[in-house]
């Protein structure tokens, strides 16, 4: 019987927003197991490493050069019959590494019902009929926009950023302020519903702005950011609501305008939470959540779909009407968007791992398609033994050297190596590196689908 451990060859996309040449983690990881004709070009952007069975960029078994999709469909036991049946013989998740040099589009991913409708109506722009909730884990310091800000912050920016108020329209801005005044933090369901309707009206008005008005407002906005960064987006008599990082916001606006001159995204910025993630920090985005990534290297895991509804910071197809109609208009502080990891209980660490403060952390979003475990083994000989799972896993090494064992099969692991581990198989990883403790950390991320305890999360709910 085949040992369910496959080393994978994974493709990398070269979108314009990717980090260039060897600066790109996605490129470095791809090069670790690349075809012989692949070399990293010094001036080419490398954006996304894809690990999975999605047909747009399918992973291959290094040994046989067969696609992973072929292999899991030929042998249902690799994913387990239950997972294979539930997800049509395809891996339920798409695992990625993103290397971001400049902003990705302001976007959201449709829920299952909308995805089916969009795919039927416009399969060229919406190639999948699946939803796409996704989780982001920072490898390097990350900047992004995620979800609508608390309403009080939006009200502040409407007053403090004159070009924003001009672009939306004074009357529309005033109507919003009047609608939410005194109810910005309400927990009453009916009032919250009214707040969301008001936010939808305001945001839709912004997104439907005429291009000549956007251009004029953008010039004024950037001029303000350049001339007075310390008081940017601030009011004289509003110490409680003024941003604590005015100069940082000004510099980001200037940077975004250099990347996408006079773009509507410069104004969407004031509606969305600005987030920084340090390595190991994470956030989870439900389907229909608005977001944009600005910079950094990240691990990303999502339901297997490539659907994106875009409306800013992009030269690609923009679908403003669909975006403004599909959003939930939920609003919350950024801390509520972050996902806190917990100790993963199904790993056994050996003595060398325990004594070196090695750990396995679980990032477990409230959906059935995937979870991710980050394991850091901080000493030579440190070992982690993972209990068998009832579904498939994909593991990538992002630092250090080690080995991976499943059954009687053992493979060496280096930075960028990617492996598929089949269902119901015990998996052992071990640090085989050398050097001091700080330098000698063997780090892996493992995405997996285990339906145990998640049977009720039908369709991600």
From Swiss-Prot:
Its EC number is 5.3.1.8. It is found in: Cytoplasm. GO terms for cellular component: cytosol. Its cofactor is Zn(2+). SUPFAM superfamilies: RmlC-like cupins. Zn(2+) binds at residues 107, 109, 134, 291. Keywords: Cytoplasm, Isomerase, Metal-binding, Zinc. It catalyses: D-mannose 6-phosphate = D-fructose 6-phosphate. It comes from the Eukaryota. Pathway: Nucleotide-sugar biosynthesis; GDP-alpha-D-mannose biosynthesis; alpha-D-mannose 1-phosphate from D-fructose 6-phosphate: step 1/2. Pfam families: PMI_typeI_C (PF01238), PMI_typeI_cat (PF20511), PMI_typeI_hel (PF20512). The active site is at 310. Belongs to the mannose-6-phosphate isomerase type 1 family. Involved in the synthesis of the GDP-mannose and dolichol-phosphate-mannose required for a number of critical mannosyl transfer reactions. This is Mannose-6-phosphate isomerase. It comes from Emericella nidulans (strain FGSC A4 / ATCC 38163 / CBS 112.46 / NRRL 194 / M139) (Aspergillus nidulans). The gene is manA.
